[in-house]
Structures are given as structure tokens and as C-alpha cells.
Swiss-Prot record:
Belongs to the CedA family. The keyword Cell cycle applies. One of its GO terms (biological process) is regulation of cell division. It comes from the Bacteria. In vitro, binds double-stranded DNA, but not single-stranded DNA. One of its GO terms (molecular function) is double-stranded DNA binding. Keywords: Cell cycle, Cell division, DNA-binding. In pull-down experiments interacts with aceE, dnaK, glmS, lpp, rplB, rplC, rpoB, ybcJ, zwf. Disulfide bonds: none annotated. InterPro entries: CedA-like_sf, Cell_div_activator_CedA. Activates the cell division inhibited by chromosomal DNA over-replication. It comes from Escherichia coli (strain K12). This is Cell division activator CedA.
Length: 80
């Protein structure tokens, strides 16, 4: 008899983007990406939704941050 997988109905924790009025002043805009800024050595995406920005988690690669931004944008188009 096989053992059941532990924590079968464990909730998936999803990242809830922080809402900010604007990217912080000490963030450096990455010219080659639409939504990516460099913040404390990490790459963060800021996506303008309505009147505020949604902030991504910190990524080590700028492409990942841009991919996150594109995904958020697509989800935003679906809900509106």
C-alpha cells in the first residue's frame, strides 16, 4: 500500500503585488526593458494599473521581472 502524499490540500501561497504610488527615486530604470527597474542590486518590475503601480518580487535577472510584468498586464486585461 502506497503512502498518501503529505499535505495534499495545502494552500498554494501566491505573491500579492504591493501597490505603490510610483517607483522609488533611488530605483534605476533599465532602458532595454519596459517595466524593469534596478533596486538594491535586484531587478523589480513596476506595472502601472489604474492610478498606482504594482511592484513585483525582486528577481536576479531582468528578463524574469519583465516576464512577471507581462503576465500581470495580461491578467489585468482579462479582469477589466
Amino acid at each position: 500500500m502506497k503512502k498518501p502524499l503529505r499535505q495534499q490540500n495545502r494552500q498554494i501561497i501566491s505573491y500579492v503585488p504591493r501597490t505603490e504610488p510610483a517607483p522609488p527615486e533611488h530605483a534605476i530604470k533599465m532602458d532595454s526593458f519596459r517595466d524593469v527597474w534596478m533596486l538594491r542590486g535586484k531587478y523589480v518590475a513596476f506595472v502601472l494599473m489604474g492610478e498606482s503601480f504594482l511592484r513585483s518580487p525582486a528577481f536576479t535577472v531582468p528578463e524574469s521581472a519583465q516576464r512577471w510584468a507581462n503576465q500581470i498586464r495580461q491578467e489585468g486585461e482579462v479582469t477589466e
